[in-house]
């Protein structure tokens, strides 16, 4: 039997990741009418734009679900978000502004926890709303099969019969209205939005055009800081970490990581912190564009990285960042629980994050404009007295530096010899002054 089912499995249990929106509502009711036995599963990821989670399973039952469950995924999402932060698992940046992989983190949690819940109900066929051109179809495929090796995939949006009968939002809205549900299609936005407690993604439609900028987006986790009429006051915030875990904001301790992240979102959101505009490579290698929000993670990451640079040495920081970029890409590809990803993140958690204890005070202004005002940690290896020109005990002397510089003569001689070889081969031309070294020939092209 194929893993991916192209036709509706009549008479069988089919689990659907149910959001309560038009697409999944129409799909669920359609599957019921066609003879399947739909089970609805909704993930509570702390979405900032979801007003009433409890109402979603009730809707699913009205539309024909045999059973509807609400799965609280917030604690697991917070834990995975912290692991990503500790490992610096963020590979998409533009001019130093970071995308915090919040959608891939949400998919890792949703794809495992919902399928685990389905397995409890003896539901071994899963459907969701991901499209065939996107990243999510592969992420959910991987996480689903990792959780339940017997899982089969049925997506209404890959079923030609469903597409023929309910191919667009207008058709879905009419279908639900005729069924007696009085479903009103919401006003069409200029872009689509997907969110969870860690961040929001805005993409597609008008945002596919690079001439449409961030200003067409209505933020859901913070303020539109680019608008002059939006008042944004300067604010100082102190973030405290203990052994790599954020534990306090402005002196208030948060034993519950979920509550700390929500408060960090509120603080960062008041300034529009963490918004970014990124061009990225999807899993299929086609480029896409997204506008992202992550006010809380951005705030925590500023403080975390400040402590990383003050506590660890250069080689450790280099390895942390190189490994973080590799791990970020694995996370993006839906491989967060693969062995190579676990190896990278647990190494960072054990040898980098465990030493991160201290407090960082930050002044937030508009958007990603901020200043670090103070850094305190008992673990700091930053010690200004080591570089003091005053006489201090334990400092190195001029004679020590003379010896160190003399040892550099060996590699300087080697470098000079290499440059001579390159000049003889025509790769370099030796001139004078500012033109001392110039690439020539093919190397300059």
Swiss-Prot record:
InterPro entries listed in its UniProt record: Arg_succ_synth_type2_subfam, Arginosuc_syn_C, Arginosuc_syn_N, Arginosuc_synth, Arginosuc_synth_CS, Arginosuc_synth_type_1_subfam, AS_cat/multimer_dom_body, AS_multimer_C_tail
Reaction(s) catalysed by this chain's protein: L-citrulline + L-aspartate + ATP = 2-(N(omega)-L-arginino)succinate + AMP + diphosphate + H(+)
Transmembrane segments: none
Family annotation (Pfam families): Arginosuc_syn_C (PF20979), Arginosuc_synth (PF00764)
Residues reported to bind L-citrulline: 99, 135, 139, 192, 201, 203, 280
Keywords: Amino-acid biosynthesis, Arginine biosynthesis, ATP-binding, Cytoplasm, Ligase, Nucleotide-binding
Gene Ontology annotations of biological process type: argininosuccinate metabolic process; L-arginine biosynthetic process; urea cycle
CDD domains: ASS
A GO cellular-component term linked to this record: cytoplasm
Residues reported to bind ATP: 17-25, 43, 129, 131, 136, 194
EC assignment: 6.3.4.5
MF annotations from Gene Ontology: argininosuccinate synthase activity; ATP binding; protein homodimerization activity
UniProt key word Amino-acid biosynthesis: yes
S-S pairs: none
EC category: ligase
Record has Methyltransferase as a keyword: no
Leader sequence segment: none
Subcellular location: Cytoplasm
Metabolic or biological pathway: Amino-acid biosynthesis; L-arginine biosynthesis; L-arginine from L-ornithine and carbamoyl phosphate: step 2/3
Binding positions (L-aspartate): 131, 135-136
Family listed: Belongs to the argininosuccinate synthase family. Type 2 subfamily.
Subunit structure: Homotetramer.
Protein name, entry field: Argininosuccinate synthase
Record organism: Polaromonas naphthalenivorans (strain CJ2)
